[in-house]
Design a protein with these regions (language model features):
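Conserved RNase H-like, two-metal-ion catalytic cores of nucleic-acid enzymes
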Residues: 4-144
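A generic structural-conservation signal
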Residues: 112, 163-164
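Mixed-charge, glycine-rich, non-catalytic linkers/tails in nucleic-acid processing enzymes
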Residues: 120, 162, 168-204
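Amphipathic alpha-helical transducer elements in NTP-driven molecular machines
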Residues: 144-151, 183-186
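Glycine-rich, acidic and aromatic/proline-enriched surface loops and short helix-turn segments
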Residues: 155-160
Length: 204
């Protein structure tokens, strides 16, 4: 009984967070600057991970900015840009990217709203597994059916996420291939965000 109540409470909190995000999306003025971002790092949260790069894409004009270890476009400059953004959009940014930035930069205090496409994916497509089995997206491995990962959405949207790190990729060392992978992640997220905005009309 106790376990059931805990599970129900957790589901209720998740649903509340999802609906709050929907309300946030509906209140966004059209002139606000939407920044889609992704980052790559050496590892997981609470493991002393180091950020290798941050890629930002302006959804209004599709311009892309890269912040890495160059003096003129450093990671800390990228962090400051994120703080100034009106709206931050990304896949799993609530669960990973933003906490990782705060872990490394404790003073990080974004002023804008954070919208997580992973949360929206679970809200708008709770039965995505059924859809996958019916449509069978081209080239999509069956292990990704029903998943809300960015890799899975890449197949559904025909905007394939890269495979850096699955074979020879080394996350401990920054490389051009890693940067390309991060840039492609923002491309997939941009298309996913466009889909989520269309789906949001069903909740209006």
């Amino acid at each position: 009984m106790t376990e059931t109540l805990i599970q129900f409470s957790s589901q209720k909190r998740t649903r509340s967070r999802q609906m709050n995000m929907i309300q946030t999306m509906q209140q966004i003025p059209s002139m606000n600057k939407e920044i889609i971002f992704d980052l790559e790092s050496t590892g997981l949260l609470r493991q002393g991970s180091r950020i290798h790069c941050i890629v930002m894409r302006d959804s209004n004009d599709d311009s892309t900015s890269v912040f890495d270890h160059r003096p003129e476009q450093s990671i800390i400059q990228g962090v400051k840009e994120l703080e100034r953004a009106d709206i931050l959009i990304g896949h799993n940014i609530i669960g990973y990217d933003i906490p990782l930035i705060k872990e490394q930069y404790p003073d990080f205090n974004p002023q804008g709203q954070a919208i997580d496409t992973l949360v929206l994916s679970r809200l708008f497509y709770p039965h995505i597994d059924t859809r996958d089995y019916e449509r069978r997206p081209d080239g999509m491995p069956q292990r990704l059916y029903g998943r809300h990962s960015l890799e899975a959405w890449g197949y559904r949207l025909k905007c394939f996420k890269g495979d850096f790190g699955k074979h020879e990729g080394n996350w401990s060392v920054y490389s051009p291939e890693m940067l390309d992978y991060c840039i492609q992640d923002t491309e997939v997220t941009l298309k996913l965000w466009a889909l989520m905005k269309r789906r949001m009309k069903d909740y209006s």
